[in-house]
């Protein structure tokens, strides 16, 4: 059954022009290292990401991972002339994957010279935010205190009972590698400040147990009453929704470099808008607060505003550097509809030259002529993203007229921007290979994973059930006859 599904995928890849590979690894419930291979390509103008297989590995070094990927690619691209089909490979930014000398991407590129490496942009967004938090001590302290809220309520069911009584919802756990959890924690604490204050006061008064809980509840209560903490919480409450939006966009299967450029511009504009509100974030000091005992070291409002400006600048600068479209991804800027009018006045010759060097299968002179026509026509300036422009050209029956543009658009759409599909496959792995089924073979694991991950593809496959029956019927001689003529 698993081989039948793979043969259908092989047939799809045979009919497509370009292919990209996505790979990542994780540890299953049996503590075995599992590497997943996903193939991305176009089917009838729509991008698909097909699960190929899980591969159990004894070692997680670059050579072992590259051999696994090469073994999978050699099955879907068996001929030497097919190697030019592989135009992209997407992994995380670990050195074993991204190393220029001995990394997986460099080893794969030796056999597939057009397979350009893409560092998963969802991972890069996580790195941007980690840099913004770690470089400023006050913000690092703020997130340390903030994570204390979720940690406090994960230690005891009795504490959770107080939380359910006052707040009515649980606090998300803080995870370093998943910044959407950090943003949810910020939003939850901000929206339920009064309820959390009531909860901690209730614990301090009515707790019957260890004094550690009372001491920690008192400390968290002081955080919620601290003016600096609330100011930083207000700032990140304005930032995090935009992070959530971008994080969700980076997990779309239909994401292409051109659309990601628009997402990049929107995110930078949103951060700049929040940056302009920084002087009004910290509330004025009331007479009651001035009469209270002040801490020995107090940070002025000007200094706190400077800190938040610094955090905003760090986010923007690191975001621009990590989301910079250079080398092979510079070709995405050729289809930025907002720049078509400017390109009509001054053609981007340098970007076109870089694109032709990255993808030798393109005819540079013909591509230049076709792009010049697109830049001069108003109807193409309404398209947002490479997918929309490709569909417009196909619906207008212009595939032959703009053959090189179509080819470049297919390359851009096929190029993956994130390895989110690998994370989704790992979720399926946890559901399929559980503690009670931890001794299943790799063939059975891949078969069950294929049925779960690619169920829509299998349902749409012609005569799939009949072919499975015929395969089992011909495996060996049986007493019962499964095939009737």
Short names for language-model regions:
Residues 1-485:
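Alpha-helical structural modules in large enzymes and assemblies
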